[in-house]
Amino acid sequence: MKSLALNGLGRIGRLAVRILAERRPDLLCALNDPAPLDQVVHLLRHDSVHGCPGLPIDGLQEAGQDFLRLGDRKVPLFHAPDPAEIPFPACASLVVEASGRFTRRADAARHLKGAVSHVVISAPSPDADLTVIAPVNGAELDLARHRVISNASCTAHATAPMLRILDQAFGLDHVGMSTVHVVTNDQRLLDLPHKDLRRARAAFMSIIPTTSSAFGALHQVMPTLPEGFGGVALRVPTLNVNLVDVVATLRRDADVAGIRRAFQDAAGGAWKDLVGLAEPHAVSSDFTGRAESVVMDLDLTMTLGPRFVKVFGWHDNETGYAARLCDLVTDLVGRI
């Protein structure tokens, strides 16, 4: 049976392992991370945001080889720093590249050896064969042509449904967005040098304006977006759950009730399980563990004119994104 391997056990990699171990434990045949076995096991067992996993996890060594025991399954763990050097077994037909280091096609393609025919990068890529945010553009995927695939970013997965639903219901004339985004490990805990001088500042002391890779990914996936679409990311001193704020001028008149109805219809129909609806008076911590790509806070919907609107959507930037990553790779393994 064709299976998948995963390189990189950071925030997204570890959550993907949890999800796959619960959904499809038969799919995961190998892992790679430079960290020692005891550290990998500790971080899989204990998570400051998401708590302990729902299955037993342990580490063991046999004949000099490290293994992770995930429930009833034993999965080999390698520690190679270079994708070309990872001895993934012949069962691995697809590699999830989740290290965050190999986002360019040429680097990720170093996995394409032996039985491995496809790679999915768990981050935006400037030159992957295809960037996928299903169902916005998943139908375009051609396994013969697209061998190195990007799963875009958490912000892109949250924003794409908001844009598509507005566009289908009312048409988009102009659109921009901002994301209130949690701290990531590409910031400094204390003031230290960084090429982005704002990110050089202590992450838990300030609101830090910066750029977002989501804009490039969204333009790749939705090439008909209005010219000039862009925005800003505001990094805030929290650990989980982002808020996307989309502002748009529409091609047709809309009121608050009509906008809310469009998102309610989408959440119960074509976007079921990908778009959720928030309970009243929610705050960010209420959305930890939500697996949807975005959870619309319709109480915050505003109209600033008959065609000038603001809509807001929350997303667990870790759980939601890891869930979409697992959706994609599970589908691909079944088709390769």
Residue ranges and their predicted role:
Residues P34-L37, S125-P126, S153-T155, T179-D186, ...:
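Glycine-rich beta-alpha junction loops
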Residues L6, G10, R14, R101-R105, ...:
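Electropositive phosphate-/nucleotide-binding environments in soluble metabolic enzymes
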